[in-house]
């Protein structure tokens, strides 16, 4: 359901409106707001089509204003809205942010979908509480357009999406916005250009909570900060930490729920809590267990962790992390110890992880030493097993013995004694095992020694664990004796073991180069007390082992020295290679820092190690020895330094290198400066010496004079060529001396290179040129090494004697300033006069002058193209300029104005014909036609000058002669008329055509020519006879037949004219009577003028190549004139003797009018042929009879006093015109004189033919005076008028057909298509209606009527074709004038002609049996080609005319009033309804068939 104001609202939206007080109140009423403006706090003005903001001063309490989707281009008139908080201006045409100083409470501003290129005027000083800014879909591009955001300290929401921002420096702007929380940048190129876009913006904006389409969570910010600190690895760890925290939080919430449930459940039914390795408690337990395990391993001599670091294995290997994977594995250390002991006992089965393979694969190598060691180890193992078994047996015996003892005495010390005894018994073989192992492994490499040491620690740990299991052993008496001593030994041993472990750990964590050092080197020698054993055998073995250990230690020291020497050699080679690499690359290696983390190279993973340079293999290649195994290459650390230290070392080397280069450059610059100082001192000395010598002489004056001359020329040229900014029209050249046409080619007295020495050069260029000239002159002659004072004096005297010295020295600054002022004043007057004159004559210029890019350009009127101005005139000499100063400024107005040689189109002002000047017209016409004959290879059109001036005698006659006629030529050339002026072009063409005929009237009794004109006419006639004889010699049979037909017409025309001269006085009286009578010749406004051409002109026009249709038209015109003459004889006979004189008068009048119309028709068709014929012959005609009562077409109406000579539109190309008019003045004048002579000869021939024609006309008029026939007494006099009406229509149609035949040359295809589908036009059958009037003539004129009807039928066919062409070519807009003319003729025919023919035809007459129908049938049989164009049944003609229907009764009453009683009218006008279907396109473009009923008057005959 529509709102009441919906219609009004729709009207407001349709167009652009303005905000008015009434409109605002209507909107408030529609939106149910207050009618009092100050009571409203919101106002909805969106989608209203407003152009500007206005009339809102009374709405002072507004807090929200909606102005979106309008056409607002400027923010204005908001000064009174001081409480405004929200302003919505999206979808408008705003280009600048301004005029918001008074809206200090503005919180939200929406300017999206506008044309803003820069953010401005919204800082905190202007809008202190601005919180939200939406400026999407604008034209923001870089950081400069966003720089004003730094001043918005309170802005928290910023939407910049869908702009054109591509500058990554905007991040710096966002960093300086302290309150920015929401930022939208999507849709800008910078999003893809900014690396790590989201992390970068999160780090830049500390308060950012929402970026683009996603929020910024604390987790995102924490990950971004971790990424900034530690790279991607730190970000990964941070993500894991947040994931654990989230899982812990979820688990705690679930456990709290479980605890709440378990409170109300029995213990056996309670649900266990969720546990995970990620919980902090479990992590703490794992970490504490790991710490305890490491502490125990340190105490008991385990070095697994240290070995992991040395071997490159990760600390998360199985053997070190099995206890950390779950809490259950960390319950007890005993089970793990048992597992290790078992694996130690079965080492041969599978080697332990982290141990070197050499310990287990020695037998595979087949080495004798390894086999010996394996055998020795086997024996030692057997001995250890035997000792263990003995100890177990001793334990059993001890247990039995203890049972027999007094339990009370030993109860207090059972466990301690057992432990001490176990230590004494078990420690001895362990020590021996250690010694044996060390003695056998002295010859092994450093790595193997370390492995063995770690293996020994494993044995110690295993034995220690076994001792802890012995809890049930009770001390015996012997053991109790040594209890105190054993405790002391135990303490000492533990201390020594801890020290050994500490020292060994330090050795293992040292550098790679110190790996060869014996880990037991710093071990203290065991004390005698510690090493003392009870067994003598063991004691001896211990001593032996001890001795071997000492030897091994000494040998190890020697090996260490050798290793250090070797290390030094390697360091030298490494340094040499590094130097070579630095010299080759001169850059820091790309992979110095190892996986992006600053850690020792020994902690790098295998992949990182593989990516480094294989220094070990390089070392091997340098030393010439084979490389070690692959695992050493991958696991051995590459450098002893961390990556940071390595980078610092490399940077320091580069700094030293750069410092050396910088020092070298500084030295080089110092040397160059010293050389420059030396050269400068030498040059200054030379210059000083030269200046002294110049001052001594007087040559300075000569140089100064030359420079002053050049400077004055340059300054004057700069002034004269000043740009057009200072003056409205710029430097327009003088029309008095210079034109835009080509200058005459004259030989210049001064060579071009000397004509203007300072042309186009600035002051600096002139000075440089003078310096080059001076230097070249000095270089031509080698300077003498020394100049004596005598030579200087001679040179000074020679300079003083120079002639130009006095002239140069007389100039003073004051005189030069006065000269410059005079030149400036003269230039201003020159420019002002030229500009004023040009502006005063601006109507004559086709083109306009406009300032484009600080230059004055010529803008073409028809095409709009820009062209450069012609070159300005040369500099005016001082003598000429002084004369111009004395002349009056108005003297420029007398200059002859000339036009540019550009294509022209008619102005939009109405065309006004000029008064005819007969002599000039004839001279120019003859000249143009002779020229056209000479240029027969060009297009077959002629040109004629518009007689604008009396004479063309001036110094620049050729330019004037060409330019004055260019406008008239363009008006006549239809090819150059643009499609925008089609109607105007058609009107201009018709006017020109009628002006031509008005100028060449041929019906007056005598030619009112002057003596000069008669002479020229005689010359033109003589030349015309020559041309006619030449033309007849080249005719073919077809042309001869046409000439015969035309000769017959000429004979009849001569008879008519002879008779017309005798009855001229009676004709004048008849005209007066006809003007006062009820039936007039005048057809009212819109009809054509009746004009007649002489037979001579028609004969001369005929072209051998003319079309057949044109010949038929001419033959029809001649034969219809014959028919008109014979019908006039019948009129005379019908009147009888008493009415003979009147019949003669009326018959003569009808004959003359018919002849006029047929001649006019022939002229139109002949002229149409002239437009297309390849050759042109002169057309010389007579003045037409201007009938004041003759109706004229409204397209050719003009004052009868104005007559202008107009010729056929020319087609001569502009290049040929230019070549003809501008080749030379003398040649032009010579051709003019020749053309004048030819014109005089042609005029004389025409005058002779004119006299003969009048004589023949008098004889013909005398022959046509017999008495009328009584059979035709009942035919009224209006018959002659009716006969005259048909040629009138034919003449108009011929004229328009001529135009229509050429309209397709300048109409676009769309207009032609519209014209083809046009519905209205002239009827093709109206000529047949007129033909029927000729069928009732008497049988006496049957022979003459047959020939007339034959040609008339051919004319009708040709007219049908012409009408068809006209309908197909004319545009509906262009045919409005044609339609009016056609309707006027048809209305006249309907009202007069048709009804009057009804009175002529008798009731009992049989139309189909007349001689005319018989002739038509016979002609149709003879000519089957033309039969197709005629109706099948010629006896029933039906013609449809488009007209405004009038009542048939009225026309019948009028005809009955004038009808004689003897004649009964036949009802031939009927109004019938006709139904037919039309295919019509609807609005959607679909074809719809509609049934249409039309009522029309149909004439049946």
Curated annotation (Swiss-Prot):
What InterPro entries would the database entry show? Answer: Cilia_flagella_integrity (IPR050576), Leu-rich_rpt (IPR001611), Leu-rich_rpt_4 (IPR025875), LRR_dom_sf (IPR032675)
List residues of the LRRCT domain: 189-227
For bias type Basic and acidic residues, the affected ranges are: 1027-1045, 1052-1074, 1270-1284, 1347-1376, 1402-1433
Q: Where is the composition biased (Acidic residues)?
A: 521-531, 877-891, 1448-1459
Write out the entry's keywords from A to Z. Cell projection, Cilium, Leucine-rich repeat, Repeat
Enumerate the LRR repeat regions by residue range. Answer: 38-60, 61-82, 83-104, 105-126, 129-150, 154-175
Q: Name one GO cellular component term.
A: axoneme
Q: Where is this region: Disordered?
A: 245-346, 508-531, 808-827, 862-891, 1021-1086, 1100-1175, 1260-1294, 1307-1379, 1402-1436, 1448-1468
Q: What Gene3D superfamilies has UniProt attached to this entry?
A: Ribonuclease Inhibitor
Bias-annotated ranges (Low complexity): 313-327, 1115-1126
Subcellular localization, as worded in the UniProt entry: Cell projection, Cilium
* GO BP terms: axoneme assembly; chemical synaptic transmission; cilium assembly
Domain of life of the organism encoding this protein: Eukaryota
Tell me, what does this protein do in biology?
A: Cilium-specific protein required for cilia structures.
Family recorded in the similarity comment: Belongs to the DNAAF1 family.
Name recorded for this polypeptide: Dynein axonemal assembly factor 1 homolog
The protein's organism comes out as Drosophila persimilis (Fruit fly)
Q: Which gene encodes it?
A: dtr
């Amino acid at each position: 359901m529509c709102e009441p104001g919906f219609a009004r609202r729709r009207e407001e939206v349709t167009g652009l409106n303005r905000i008015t007080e009434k409109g605002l109140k209507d909107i408030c009423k529609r939106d149910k707001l207050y009618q009092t403006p100050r009571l409203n706090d919101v106002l909805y003005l969106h989608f209203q089509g407003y152009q500007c903001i206005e009339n809102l001063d009374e709405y002072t309490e507004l807090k929200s204003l909606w102005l979106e989707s309008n056409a607002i281009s400027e923010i204005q008139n908001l000064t009174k809205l001081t409480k405004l908080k929200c302003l919505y201006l999206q979808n408008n045409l705003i280009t600048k942010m301004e005029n918001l100083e008074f809206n200090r409470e503005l919180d939200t501003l929406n300017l999206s979908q506008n044309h803003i290129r820069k953010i401005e005027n919204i800082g905190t000083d202007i809008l202190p509480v601005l919180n939200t800014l939406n400026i999407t879909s604008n034209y923001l591009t870089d950081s400069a357009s966003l720089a004003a955001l730094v001043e918005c300290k309170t802005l928290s929401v910023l939407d910049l999406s869908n702009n054109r921002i591509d500058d990554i420096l905007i991040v710096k702007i966002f960093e300086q916005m302290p309150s920015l929380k929401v930022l939208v940048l999507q849709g800008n190129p910078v999003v893809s250009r900014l690396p790590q876009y989201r992390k970068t913006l999160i780090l830049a904006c500390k308060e950012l909570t929402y970026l683009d389409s996603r929020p910024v969570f604390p987790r995102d910010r924490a990950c971004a900060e971790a990424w900034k600190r530690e790279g991607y690895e730190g970000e990964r760890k941070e993500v894991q930490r947040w994931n654990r925290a989230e899982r812990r939080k979820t688990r705690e919430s679930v456990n709290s729920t479980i605890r709440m449930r378990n409170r109300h459940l029995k213990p056996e039914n309670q649900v266990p809590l969720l546990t995970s390795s990620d919980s902090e408690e479990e992590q703490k337990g794992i970490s504490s267990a790991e710490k305890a395990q490491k502490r125990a391993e340190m105490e008991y001599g385990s070095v697994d962790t240290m070995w992991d670091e040395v071997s490159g294995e990760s600390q998360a290997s199985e053997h070190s992390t099995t206890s950390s994977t779950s809490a259950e594995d960390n319950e007890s250390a005993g089970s793990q110890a048992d597992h290790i002991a078992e694996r130690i006992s079965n080492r041969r089965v599978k080697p332990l992880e982290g141990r070197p393979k050499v310990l287990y694969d020695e037998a595979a190598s087949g080495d004798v030493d390894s086999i010996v060691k394996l055998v020795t180890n086997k024996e030692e193992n057997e001995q250890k097993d035997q000792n263990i078994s003995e100890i177990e047996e001793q334990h059993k015996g001890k247990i039995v013995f203890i049972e027999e003892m007094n339990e009370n005495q030993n109860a207090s010390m059972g466990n301690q004694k057992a432990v001490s005894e176990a230590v004494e018994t078990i420690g001895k073989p362990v020590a021996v095992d250690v010694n044996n192992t060390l003695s056998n492994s002295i010859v092994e490499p450093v790595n193997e020694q370390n492995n063995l040491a770690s293996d020994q620690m494993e044995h110690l740990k295993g034995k220690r664990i076994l001792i802890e299991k012995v809890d049930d052993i009770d001390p015996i008496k012997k053991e109790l004796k040594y209890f105190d001593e054993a405790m002391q030994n135990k303490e000492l041993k533990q201390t020594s073991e801890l020290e050994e472990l500490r020292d060994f750990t330090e050795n293992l964590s040292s550098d790679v180069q110190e790996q060869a050092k014996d880990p037991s080197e710093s071990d203290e020698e065991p004390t005698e007390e510690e090493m003392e054993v009870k067994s003598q055998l063991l004691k001896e073995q211990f001593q032996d082992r001890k001795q071997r250990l000492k030897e091994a230690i000494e040998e190890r020291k020697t090996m260490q020295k050798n290793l250090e020497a070797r290390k030094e050699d390697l360091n030298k080679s490494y340094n040499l290679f590094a130097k070579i690499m630095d010299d080759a690359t001169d850059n820091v290696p790309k992979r110095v820092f190892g996986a992006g983390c600053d850690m020792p190279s020994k902690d790098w993973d295998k992949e990182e190690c593989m990516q480094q340079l294989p220094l070990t293999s390089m070392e091997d290649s340098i030393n010439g020895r084979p490389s070690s195994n692959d695992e050493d290459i991958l696991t051995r650390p590459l450098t002893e330094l961390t990556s940071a230290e390595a980078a610092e070392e490399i940077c320091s080397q580069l700094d030293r290198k750069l410092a050396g280069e910088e020092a070298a450059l500084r030295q080089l610059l110092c040397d160059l400066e010293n050389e420059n100082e030396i050269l400068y001192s030498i040059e200054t000395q030379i210059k000083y010496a030269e200046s002294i010598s110049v001052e001594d002489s007087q040559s300075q004056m000569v140089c100064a004079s030359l420079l002053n001359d050049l400077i004055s020329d340059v300054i004057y040229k700069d002034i004269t060529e000043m740009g057009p900014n200072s003056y409205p029209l710029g430097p327009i050249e003088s029309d008095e001396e210079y034109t835009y046409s080509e200058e005459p080619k004259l030989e210049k007295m001064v060579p071009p290179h000397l004509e203007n020495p300072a042309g186009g050069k600035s002051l600096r260029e002139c000075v440089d040129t003078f310096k080059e000239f001076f230097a070249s002159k000095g270089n031509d002659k080698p300077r003498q090494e020394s100049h004596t004072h005598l030579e200087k004096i001679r040179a000074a005297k020679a300079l003083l004697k120079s002639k130009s010295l006095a002239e140069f020295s007389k100039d003073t600054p004051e005189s030069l300033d006065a000269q410059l002022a005079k030149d400036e004043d003269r230039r201003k007057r020159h420019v002002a006069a030229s500009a004023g004159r040009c502006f005063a004559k601006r109507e004559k210029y086709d083109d306009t002058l406009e300032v484009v890019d600080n230059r004055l350009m010529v803008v073409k009127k028809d095409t709009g193209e820009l062209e450069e101005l012609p070159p300005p005139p040369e500099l005016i000499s001082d003598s000429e300029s002084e004369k111009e100063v004395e002349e009056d400024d108005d003297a420029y107005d007398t200059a002859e104005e000339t036009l540019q040689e550009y294509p022209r189109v008619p102005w939009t002002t109405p065309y006004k014909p000029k008064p005819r000047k007969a002599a000039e017209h004839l001279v120019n016409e003859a000249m143009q036609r002779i020229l056209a004959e000479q240029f027969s290879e060009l297009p077959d059109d002629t040109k004629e000058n518009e007689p604008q001036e009396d004479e063309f005698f001036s110094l620049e006659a050729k330019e004037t002669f060409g330019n004055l006629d260019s406008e008239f030529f363009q008006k006549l050339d239809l090819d150059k008329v643009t499609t925008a002026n089609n109607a105007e072009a058609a009107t201009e063409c018709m006017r020109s055509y009628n002006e031509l005929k008005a100028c060449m009237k041929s019906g007056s009794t005598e030619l009112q020519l002057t003596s000069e004109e008669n002479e020229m006419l005689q010359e033109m006639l003589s030349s015309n006879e020559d041309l006619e004889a030449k033309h007849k010699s080249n005719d073919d049979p077809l042309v001869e037949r046409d000439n015969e037909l035309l000769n017959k017409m000429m004979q009849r025309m001569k008879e008519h004219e002879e008779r017309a001269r005798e009855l001229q006085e009676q004709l004048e009286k008849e005209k007066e009577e006809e003007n006062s009578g009820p039936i007039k010749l005048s057809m009212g406004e819109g009809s054509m003028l009746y004009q007649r051409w002489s037979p001579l002109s028609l004969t001369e026009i005929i072209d051998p190549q003319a079309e057949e249709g044109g010949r038929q038209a001419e033959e029809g015109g001649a034969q219809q004139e014959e028919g008109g003459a014979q019908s006039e004889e019948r009129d005379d006979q019908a009147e009888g003797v008493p009415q003979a004189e009147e019949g003669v008068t009326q018959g003569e009048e009808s004959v003359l009018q018919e002849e006029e119309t047929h001649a006019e028709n022939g002229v139109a068709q002949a002229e149409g042929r002239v437009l297309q014929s390849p050759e042109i012959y002169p057309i010389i005609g007579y003045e037409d009879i201007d009938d004041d009562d003759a109706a004229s077409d409204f397209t050719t109406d003009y004052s009868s006093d104005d007559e202008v000579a107009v010729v056929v539109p020319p087609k001569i190309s502009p290049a040929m015109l230019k070549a003809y008019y501008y080749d030379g003045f003398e040649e032009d004048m010579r051709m003019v004189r020749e053309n004048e002579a030819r014109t005089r000869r042609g005029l004389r021939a025409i005058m002779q033919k004119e006299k003969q024609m009048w004589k023949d006309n008098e004889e013909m008029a005398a022959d046509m005076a017999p008495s009328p026939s009584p059979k035709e007494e009942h035919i009224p006099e209006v018959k002659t008028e009716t006969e005259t009406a048909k040629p009138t229509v034919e003449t108009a149609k011929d004229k328009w057909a001529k135009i229509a035949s050429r309209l397709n040359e300048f109409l676009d295809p769309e207009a032609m298509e519209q014209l083809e589908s046009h519905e209205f036009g002239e009827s093709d059958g109206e000529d047949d209606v007129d033909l029927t009037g000729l069928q009732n003539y008497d049988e006496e004129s049957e022979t003459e009527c047959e020939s007339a009807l034959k040609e008339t039928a051919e004319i009708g066919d040709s007219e049908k074709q012409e009408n068809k062409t006209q309908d197909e070519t004319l545009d509906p807009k262009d045919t409005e004038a044609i339609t009016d003319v056609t309707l006027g003729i048809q209305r006249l025919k309907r009202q007069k002609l048709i009804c009057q023919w009804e009175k002529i035809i008798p009731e009992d007459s049989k139309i189909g049996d007349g001689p005319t129908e018989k002739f038509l049938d016979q002609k149709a049989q003879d000519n089957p080609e033309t039969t197709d164009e005629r109706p099948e049944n010629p006896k029933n003609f039906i013609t449809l005319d488009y007209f405004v229907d009038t009542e048939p009764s009225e026309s019948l009453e009028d005809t009955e009033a004038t009808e004689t009683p003897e004649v009964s009218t036949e009802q031939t006008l009927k109004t019938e309804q006709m139904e037919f279907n039309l295919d019509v396109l609807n609005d959607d473009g679909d074809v719809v068939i509609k049934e249409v009923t039309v009522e029309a008057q149909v004439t049946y005959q």
